[in-house]
């Protein structure tokens, strides 16, 4: 790179700081995270302040007392080159806002389960949501999030149950305006929402459970397939970014191209795939949502072929890490190794905070939103060690391991 040109933290990077140091997230690659040593952190902060590499070197070399050491200077510019090669820095002179606070651990991403009520009764639902459920998050809990956390959040996901069923959904959306808002929905009520509310969402994600009324009746106990399609078409016609999420079954893999064709006919520009959690209604039993290793390999091949065939729709590459069989956690202790519980939190309809939507509330949801906010303000954090140990013990009695919730969260 040219050392006499202005440099800045790259536009696609999201810088965030907390009491544990500087973190940078790559928004173009699934928010993959970069962490840094103290010296590296000081270099990046200086880049963000001065934008001139000679001045950055001057500031860092003075702080660490290396003077004009030739060896140190060579190491400095090699590291700057590495930052550039990894697209962490780029040419430019813009100061980037660094989110968070250096003396706190504020969350950066928050999922809010507005309700456990749903007009579908999906056979794989991790929350066991359905029409017979009756809990809704209170406006008081939403107000606490808005007053104490909202200004520190990069994004908020509204989910459920079916989030749009909440009787105060419109007011909640308005209260949480500020961070990037994402709606995760079954799509059946999108056609009925006000344009003003829909336009407040940066992204709307619709889960697609089948390609016909019959399949919706079988897997979601609802005949609302046409209603879902109408909602999707309305959103794409409004030019609101929309992604279709397809949880895989073996019958879906057999006919995956038909799903892509349906999405294209509705104006969808992005499709992603996932595997349902083995919890809730999908816990502990062999179901239609279980996929053999051979079938999964078949899907990975089909996914590649479809991405090559269709250039008018972003068919997201399936993350092979999702299907890789990792070494199982069999010890009595484990730790959370991702951002869950720190940069990521989930708030349930009960107003309880847990580290992530993928970690069930009956194991991890033991702290109220009020208690959580208090711990953030006092920078005491939440120690999940005992919870994890208890969960490992309970799951072992059922012949399961803790990484059955998420294969990448624990070590």
Identify the role of each PLM range.
Residues 16-24, 29-35, 74-111, 331, ...:
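N-terminal [4Fe-4S]-dependent radical SAM core
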Residues 55, 73-82, 86-193, 200:
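Conserved alpha-helical substructure of the radical SAM core
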Residues 2, 200-203, 207-209, 214-341, ...:
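Radical SAM enzyme [4Fe-4S]-AdoMet core and its adjacent flexible, acidic
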Residues 1-48:
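Acidic, low-complexity/disordered tracts enriched in E/D and polar residues
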Residues 5, 333-335, 350-411:
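Flexible mid-to-C-terminal extensions adjoining Fe-S/redox cofactors in radical SAM and related proteins
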Residues 33-71:
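Short amphipathic alpha-helical interface segments
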């Amino acid at each position: 790179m040219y050392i006499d040109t202005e440099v800045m933290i790259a536009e696609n990077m999201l810088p965030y700081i907390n009491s544990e140091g500087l973190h940078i997230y790559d928004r173009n690659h699934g928010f993959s995270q970069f962490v840094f040593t103290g010296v590296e952190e000081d270099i990046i902060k200086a880049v963000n302040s001065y934008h001139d590499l000679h001045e950055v070197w001057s500031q860092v070399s003075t702080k660490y007392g290396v003077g004009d050491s030739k060896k140190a200077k060579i190491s400095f510019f090699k590291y700057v080159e590495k930052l550039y090669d990894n697209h962490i820095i780029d040419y430019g002179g813009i100061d980037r806002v660094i989110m968070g606070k250096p003396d706190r651990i504020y969350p950066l991403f928050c999922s809010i389960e507005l309700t456990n009520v749903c007009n579908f009764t999906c056979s794989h639902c991790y929350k066991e949501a359905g029409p017979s459920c009756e809990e809704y998050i209170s406006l008081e809990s939403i107000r606490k999030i808005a007053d104490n956390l909202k200004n520190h959040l990069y994004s908020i996901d509204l989910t459920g149950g079916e989030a749009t069923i909440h009787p105060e959904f419109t007011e909640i959306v308005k209260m949480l305006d500020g961070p990037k808002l994402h709606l995760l929905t079954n799509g059946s009520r999108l056609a009925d929402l006000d344009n003003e509310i829909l336009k407040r969402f940066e992204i709307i994600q619709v889960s697609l459970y089948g390609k016909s009324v019959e399949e919706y009746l079988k897997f979601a106990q609802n005949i609302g397939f046409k209603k879902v399609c109408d909602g999707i078409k309305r959103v794409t016609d409004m030019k609101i970014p929309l992604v279709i999420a397809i949880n895989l079954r073996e019958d879906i893999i057999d006919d995956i191209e038909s799903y892509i064709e349906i999405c294209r006919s509705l104006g969808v520009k992005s499709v992603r795939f996932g595997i349902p959690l083995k919890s809730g209604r999908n816990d502990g039993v062999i179901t239609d949502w279980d996929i053999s290793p051979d079938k999964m390999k078949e899907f990975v091949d089909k996914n590649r072929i479809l991405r090559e065939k269709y250039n008018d729709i972003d068919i997201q590459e399936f993350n092979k890490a999702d299907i890789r069989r990792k070494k199982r956690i069999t010890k009595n202790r484990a730790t959370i190794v991702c951002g869950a519980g720190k940069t990521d939190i989930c708030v349930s309809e009960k107003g309880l905070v847990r580290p992530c939507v993928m970690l069930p509330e009956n194991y991890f949801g033991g702290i109220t939103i009020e208690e959580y906010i208090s711990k953030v303000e006092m920078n005491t954090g939440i120690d999940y060690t005992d919870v994890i140990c208890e969960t490992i013990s309970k799951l072992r009695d059922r012949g399961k391991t803790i990484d059955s919730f998420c294969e990448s969260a624990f070590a």
